[in-house]
Amino acid sequence: MAGLKSFLASSWLLPVACGASQSIVPSTSATAAYSQFTIPASADVGANLVANIDDPQAVNAQSVCPGYKASDVKHSSQGFTASLELAGDPCNVYGTDVDSLTLTVEYQAKDRLNIQIVPTYFDASNASWYILSEELVPRPKASQNASVPQSDFVVSWSNEPSFNFKVIRKATGDVLFNTKGSTLVYENQFIEFVTLLPEEYNLYGLGERMNQLRLLENANLTLYAADIADPIDDNIYGHHAFYLDTRYYKVGGQNKSHTIVKSSEAEPSQEYVSYSHGVFLRNAHGQEILLRDQKLIWRTLGGSVDLTFYSGPTQAEVTKQYQLSTVGLPAMQQYNTLGFHQCRWGYNNWSEFEDVLANFERFEIPLEYLWADIDYMHGYRNFDNDQHRFSYEEGEKFLNKLHAGGRRWVPIVDGALYIPNPENASDAYETYDRGAKDDVFIKNPDGSLYIGAVWPGYTVYPDWHHPKASDFWANELVTWWNKLHYDGVWYDMAEVSSFCVGSCGTGNLSMNPAHPPFALPGEPGNVVYDYPEGFNITNATEAASASAGAASQSAAASSTTTSAPYLRTTPTPGVRNVDHPPYVINHVQPGHDLSVHAISPNSTHSDGVQEYDVHSLYGHQGINATYHGLLKVWENKRPFIIARSTFSGSGKWAGHWGGDNFSKWGSMFFSISQALQFSLFGIPMFGVDTCGFNGNTDEELCNRWMQLSAFFPFYRNHNVLSAIPQEPYRWASVIDATKAAMNIRYAILPYFYTLFHLAHTTGSTVMRALAWEFPNDPSLAAVGTQFLVGPSVMVIPVLEPQVDTVQGVFPGVGHGEVWYDWYSQTAVDAKPGVNTTISAPLGHIPVFVRGGSILPMQEVALTTRDARKTPWSLLASLSSNGTASGQLYLDDGESVYPEDTLSVDFLASRSTLRASARGTWKEANPLANVTVLGVTEKPSSVTLNGETLSSDSVKYNATSHVLHVGGLQKHTADGAWAKDWVLKW
C-alpha cells in the first residue's frame, strides 16, 4: 500500500469507466484523523524541474565533452588495466569532470567479464560519490582459473577519436557492447556512456516499471526507487540495472553461416538460432537509460562504471550466471507460501478476520494466509497493535485457531517509525525510545534527526548504515512476536517514502500524531468511484450513478493552480548539489524533484554517506535486516518476506509484489510482464494485488484475474480502503472460477515447489517467457500475453473484457513440439507461426501441458498442510517421439537447512515410466494413479514392477489417446517414492 497522493494524482493508460461504490467506513484510526492536525498538502510540493530529456535548453554532453585517452596499459593473465586521462578541456556539463580514471578489464570466468572505470584519486570524504560499498552490494569475484584465453569474450579498445571499447563474443564475432563513435563522460554528478545495438533489438529488464515485456525502442527508462501507484513506463519501487539482450540469426549455406535477423521478419519455415547475453551495471545512483535507434545511452547521477557481462548463450544460462556470481540465488520459500493469500486495507478488527476465514471455509475456497494492512496498528505505528480493535489477547486466540487449522497471518511493517509528541507524556512509543537510545536513525546534515512524515504523522527512519540498526530492528521483531505470533513480514514504504519534502517534522513534533497531507480513501473528497474499463457496458445504471458522484467530487476539489517557474541548477566546479543535481532524471514524482514523496537526498547516514548516493538501496537493506531479524524469531525457519522496494540481490531474502496497481484490465495485462521482469532479476516469488488495489473491481475483471494469478508464484488478493469488497466469495461466478483455477494450482503445488528448489539451487526461473524457453523462434520475442510455469505448463489468459475467446501461440509445433489441453487431455491442433483461437468463456482459463513433461501432483485441499497429506498422482504427457521426463523435490517445507530431503526423477520412453528416488525424507502418501497422454495404441496389459495390473484399474480412451492407470495405492502403501518402480504398458 502506497502513499495515496500518488494514487490521487495518477492517470491511467486506458479509458476509465466509472460506476457506483459501496463505501466501507474507515477504521477508527482513520476516522479519528478528522480531529488531528493535518499536514498541509504544500508540504509535499518540491521544486518544479524539467527533465533533461524534455528540456529544449539541455546540453548534449556528447557534443561538448572531450572524452578520455588511454595510456599505461598493463596486461595480466586475467585482463588489463589502463589509465584514462581527460582528452581536452573539462566540459563540466552536469558536474565536475574527473581528470584521471583507472580502467580495469577483468576476465572473471569463462562466461563472465567485468569492466570497471573509477576515479584514480579519491579519499574517505568523497569515496561514496563513486564507490559502491561491497558490504552493501558485493562485487562478483574472479574464479581462480579465469584467464583471457578461456573466456567467451574478447575486449578491444581504441583511442580514436577518444577512448572507446568493444566487447565481442568469440564464438560468433558478434559485437555485444560497442562504445565506438561516442564519448565517455565522467563527472562527480553525471556519467554517460553509449553502446551501439543491432536494428530492432530485443532487450528485457531494466526495471522496475510497468511496461511491455520487450523494451520499446525510444523508451526512456528511469531507475530511482519511488513510492507511486503503478504508472505505465515510469520508475516505481525497485532498482534493477540489468538487461538481457537476445539476438536471432538465420542459419544457412553449407558452412551454416549466421546472419542476424529482425524478429518481425522471421519466417516459420526458416531455421534460426539465438544468442543471449546479460549486462549489469553495479551502481545505486539514480539512472536513466535511453533506448534509441540502434543505440543505448546510459546515464547516472554518480557512482562508477562497473559493468559485468554474462555470455549465456541462452536466457536460462544468463540468469543463472547473474545470480550465481553476482546477486545471489533466490530464497527458498516455505511450501505453505504457495497457497492462497487474502488481504485488504480495511479489515478493522479481529472479528472481521474471523468473518473472512469463516466465509472461505463456508464456500470451500482454499486459504493459506490472512494479511493485515495498517489497520491493525496503534496509530499506524510499527510493532504496536491497536489495543481496542487488535488486542494481543484476542489476537492470540485468533492466531491459535488460525494456526491449528493450518493457516497463517502476516502483518505489514513500514519503513518509517513514529516519533512521539514531546509535549504529550502519554504519547509513548517504546520502539522509538529504544532506537533513540542507540542513535540508529537517519540525520540531517547538521546532525539533528531527520524527521519526515508517513501514516502515523511525523516519523524517523532507521539508518541501515549504523552498526546497531539491524540488531535494533531484530529486537523489535522478536519483542513483537513474543506478544503476537505472526508468520512473516510484509515490508512496505521503504523506497523510502515520506509525505513531505525535507525534515518537515523538525520543530513540529507538538503536532503529532498528524494526519497525512491528503484524504484517505473513504474520507470526504476521496470516495472511491472508479471502476474497470467496460463497467459502464455491463452495469450501465450503477456506472451512471458513480460517474455523477465522481464528477461532483472532482468539481468540489477543483481549484485554481499556478505553475512555478522551472528551476535549473548550474554546476559549480568541485561542489555537488545533491538536492537538485544539474542533470534532471525523468523521475516520476511531480516536478521530477528527488525530494518529493521521499526523504531528502541530503539526509545523512552514520558513516557520512548521503542518501543521494544510496537512495535506491534503502528497501534492500531493510529487507536484509528483516530477514536476519526473522531468523532470530525462528532459528531454522525460512523467513517469509514480501517487500515492495527491491534492488539487485533482494531475491536472496524476499519475494516481491507488484505494488499499488489498479482495478483495471490494463493492470492485469501488465502483471505478466512485471512477473517476467522479476524472473530475470532473480526474484521468482512475485505476485500482484489480484483484482486490483486502487479503485473498485467488478465481477468480470475479478473472475479473470483470480484465474490468472493462480499461476503466479505469489497469489494474493488485496484492495484499498473503502473500495467495494473483492474477496473471491463475493460473486458466485468468481467462486466457481477461483476454485476451477485453484484446482489446477493446488494439484501442481509439488511442481511449483520443485521449481523453487531449482531456482534456489541453480538460479533457474519459475515463470518464463515463451521466447526464453523456445530461444530459436524469433516470432516469440515480444510475446508477453501468455507465459510458462517452469518448462511444462503454459497459460493463455483472457486480458480484455467482454470476450469469450483468446488468441494464443503454441511454440515449437512446427518442429515436433506437442501441447495438450489440461482439461480435455488431448493434443492441440495448432499451426506454426500463427495465432490459434481458443475458447475461453468467463470462468475458464486455457492451460496447456507440454509434451515431454511429467508432473507430480497431489489432491486439492483447503490448506497446503492438508494437501500434502493426500495421495500422489502423475501426469505424463508424451512428446512426439514418445518420451517424457520430470522431477520432484520434497522436504519439511520450512527449514532453512532441512535435515531430510527427497529427490525423485521420472523418465518415460518406449512405453515405460520409471520413478527413481534418492534422499532421506520419508513421504508416506501412496501413489493413487498415473495418467499418460499421447498413447497412440491401447496397451494389451499394464504392469507395475513386473506385476500385471487388473483390467479394472486400467482405462484407455482411443479418441483422446489417454491411458489412465488407477488403484495403485495398495502397491505403494509404504509411500509413492519409498522405492523405485517401473510402469510398463
Swiss-Prot record:
It catalyses: Hydrolysis of terminal, non-reducing (1->4)-linked alpha-D-glucose residues with release of alpha-D-glucose. GO terms for molecular function: alpha-1,4-glucosidase activity; carbohydrate binding; glucosyltransferase activity. InterPro entries: Gal_mutarotase_sf_dom, Glyco_hydro_31_AS, Glyco_hydro_31_C, Glyco_hydro_31_CS, Glyco_hydro_31_TIM, Glyco_hydro_b, Glycoside_hydrolase_SF. Residues 1-25 form the signal peptide. GO terms for biological process: polysaccharide metabolic process. Its EC number is 3.2.1.20. Keywords: Glycoprotein, Glycosidase, Hydrolase, Signal. Induction: By maltose. Glycans are attached at residues 126, 145, 220, 255, 349, 424, 508, 536, 539, 602, 624, 661, 835, 881, 929, 957. It is an enzyme of class 3 (hydrolase). The keyword Nucleotidyltransferase does not apply. The keyword Phosphoprotein does not apply. It comes from the Eukaryota. The active site is at residues 492, 495, 660. Hydrolyzes malto-oligosaccharides, but has a low activity toward soluble starch. Belongs to the glycosyl hydrolase 31 family. PANTHER family: ALPHA-GLUCOSIDASE, P-TYPE DOMAIN-CONTAINING PROTEIN. This is Alpha-glucosidase. It comes from Aspergillus oryzae (strain ATCC 42149 / RIB 40).
